[in-house]
Design a protein with these regions (language model features):
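Active-site activation/catalytic loop segments of kinase-like enzymes and analogous catalytic loops
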Residues: 272-316, 332-351
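Conserved ATP-binding subdomain of kinase catalytic cores across diverse folds
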Residues: 52-55, 60-62, 69-71, 76-191, ...
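Short, Lys/Arg-enriched N-terminal segments with co-localized hydrophobic residues
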Residues: 7-22
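Juxta-kinase regulatory segment immediately upstream of eukaryotic protein kinase catalytic domains
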Residues: 23-43
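ATP/Mg2+ or Mg2+-diphosphate-binding catalytic cores
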Residues: 336-399
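Hydrophobic alpha-helical bundle architecture
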Residues: 137, 309-330
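ATP-dependent phospho-/nucleotidyl transfer catalytic cores
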Residues: 46, 50, 75, 82-85, ...
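Catalytic activation segment of kinase domains across protein kinase-like and atypical kinase folds
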Residues: 247-277, 281-285
Length: 399
């Protein structure tokens, strides 16, 4: 089960702040909650330290019949998502559609989706001096995982994200807005890195010359998916774009997936990025900031389990061209994250939250080592996928 760091915010706070938060920070969520259309009176607010981007809180209220209601309150990071209207439009369209069509492996009914709770005046979010806030439904009796605790779990993760991909065919891609331009355009990310190297704003380039050289030796990889999209060789689809294992909620009793969360990056893209991102995280034998790079490798057993689940769910909707690019998907997205972490380190750690100096560099080195291992194992990855294609009757040849 994922370990959350939770800070309790008192409803009647003392004069001194706790847990390093200022009084203003502690009072902020409490003052925001009253603007949303929810049941009961607030009895508890807890800050959930999870994720790199938004600030998240668990809100508990008590109704007149002594029933406890739970919600998720988030302050949206407007540096990452400057167009909040577009973000929330995508969120509503996606969740409303999924609420009628998505059936998860661990659910007996369609529509187990994190829904928006509007403000009292009917808006999708609240904008005030402290930022942009939204309220969402909360799931009880579930847990999430940062890494798979068994091959079977990763198989079910593949099933879940594959079902999401297949169901989202029903959403008109032209109605989904691009809230982060070039989010998974690896070639564009590389050009951004070169720009950061040229500017060297905090004088860190000299310490990362080996990493820069490794990235530059892989430029032929970066455009494999984005160029296929741009040329129309593969279709643009509505994708999740953040298929981390911890964006799946598992039932505490059955241990099956019951919901997919974090729809902020749902945008026009390619399922190759979604598939590759899941593999990047789930097959890594080390943590994402592991200093001992000898521990970093791609677990091919886990790779096969996820591939089986994913293709079982949505392989029949993927084109021959998509299937033939699938072996490269994990390599492309792993290189992309290595680039992004390296760029943030060079820029002075302005995007990702860090817990210690140099963490973004550790993250980058881990991704680049994982890329190196995936590259060496590419022949085995091809064999795994071809075996699954043949078993499932998918028309593609990757050998």
């Amino acid at each position: 089960m994922q370990n959350y760091v939770i800070y309790k915010i008192p409803i009647n706070p003392k004069n001194t702040a706790e847990n390093g938060d200022s009084m203003e920070t502690q009072n902020m969520p409490r003052n925001v909650v009253e603007h949303f259309s929810i049941q009961g009176k607030v009895v508890n607010i807890e800050r959930i330290k999870k994720g790199y981007i938004n600030s998240t809180y668990k809100v508990e209220t008590l109704s007149e019949n002594n029933h406890i209601h739970k919600y998720i309150l988030q302050r949206i990071n407007t540096n990452v998502f400057p167009d909040v209207d577009a973000l929330m439009s995508n969120f509503r369209l996606t969740t409303e559609y999924l609420s009628h069509h998505l059936l998860m492996p661990g659910s007996h009914k369609r529509g187990t989706v994190q829904m928006i709770r509007p403000t009292k005046d009917g808006k999708l979010y609240l904008k005030d001096d402290s930022g942009a806030w939204r309220m969402m439904t909360y799931f009880d009796n579930v847990y999430s995982l940062d890494i798979p605790n068994s091959p079977k779990v990763f198989y079910y993760a593949g099933l879940a994200f594959g079902r999401f991909m297949k169901v989202m065919r029903g959403v008109d891609v032209t109605k989904i807005k691009e809230v982060i331009p070039n989010f998974h355009n690896t070639k564009s990310r590389y050009l951004d890195l070169e720009d950061a190297i040229a500017k060297d704003p905090v004088n860190r380039v000299a310490e990362v010359t080996a990493e820069i050289a490794f990235v530059r030796s892989h430029t032929d990889l970066f455009g494999k998916i984005s160029e296929a999209l741009e040329s129309g060789k593969i279709p643009t689809r509505v994708c999740h774009n953040d298929c981390n294992l911890n964006n799946i909620l598992f039932d505490e009793e059955t241990h099956l997936p019951v919901a997919i969360i974090d729809m902020d990056t749902v945008m026009p893209s390619s399922p190759l990025y979604d598939y590759g991102d899941s593999m990047r995280i789930g097959t890594n034998t080390a943590t994402d900031d592991e200093k001992d790079l000898s521990k970093v490798s791609c677990d091919l057993g886990l790779y096969e389990m996820y591939a089986r689940g994913y293709l079982e769910s949505c392989g029949d909707i993927l084109t021959k061209e998509e299937l033939e690019l699938l072996p490269y998907a994990s390599l492309v997205i792993t290189s992309e994250d290595g680039i992004r972490f390296l760029m943030d380190h060079i820029n002075g750690d302005t995007y990702y939250r860090i817990d210690y100096p140099g963490q973004n560099l550790d993250r980058s080195r881990t991704q680049l080592k994982l890329l190196d291992d995936m590259e060496k194992k590419l022949p085995e990855i091809r064999k795994i996928l071809q075996k699954i294609y043949d078993e499932q009757g998918l028309d593609a040849n990757v050998l």
